[in-house]
Amino acid sequence: GCIATGSFCTLSKGCCTKNCGWNFHCNPPNQ
């Protein structure tokens, strides 16, 4: 899934689809 490092992230297919304000971390959907 997605591990967000900020607020206001949206999840789609296991990843971040929006920048979390200052940073975001996208993992493979199977994690």
Swiss-Prot record:
Keywords: Disulfide bond, Hydroxylation, Ion channel impairing toxin, Knottin, Neurotoxin, Secreted, Toxin, Voltage-gated sodium channel impairing toxin. The presence of a 'disulfide through disulfide knot' structurally defines this protein as a knottin. One of its GO terms (molecular function) is toxin activity. Highly potent toxin against both insect and some mammalian sodium channels (Nav). It potently inhibits inactivation of insect sodium channels of B.germanica (BgNav1) (EC(50)=7.8 nM) and also delays the inactivation of mammalian Nav with potent activity on Nav1.3/SCN3A and Nav1.4/SCN4A (hNav1.1/SCN1A; EC(50)=102.1 nM, rNav1.2/SCN2A; EC(50)=156.1 nM, rNav1.3/SCN3A; EC(50)=9.4 nM, rNav1.4/SCN4A; EC(50)=15.4 nM, hNav1.5/SCN5A; EC(50)=132.7 nM, mNav1.6/SCN8A; EC(50)=66.9 nM, hNav1.9/SCN9A; EC(50)=73 nM). It is found in: Secreted. The lineage of its organism: Eukaryota, Metazoa, Spiralia, Lophotrochozoa, Nemertea. Negative results: does not show effect on rat Nav1.8/SCN10A. This is Nemertide alpha-5. The modification 4-hydroxyproline is found at P28, P29. The record marks F8 as: Hydrophobic/aromatic residue important for potent activity. Belongs to the nemertide family. GO terms for cellular component: extracellular region. It comes from Ramphogordius pseudolacteus. Disulfide bonds join C2-C16, C9-C20, C15-C26. Confined to the epidermis and to the mucus layer. Its main location: secreted.
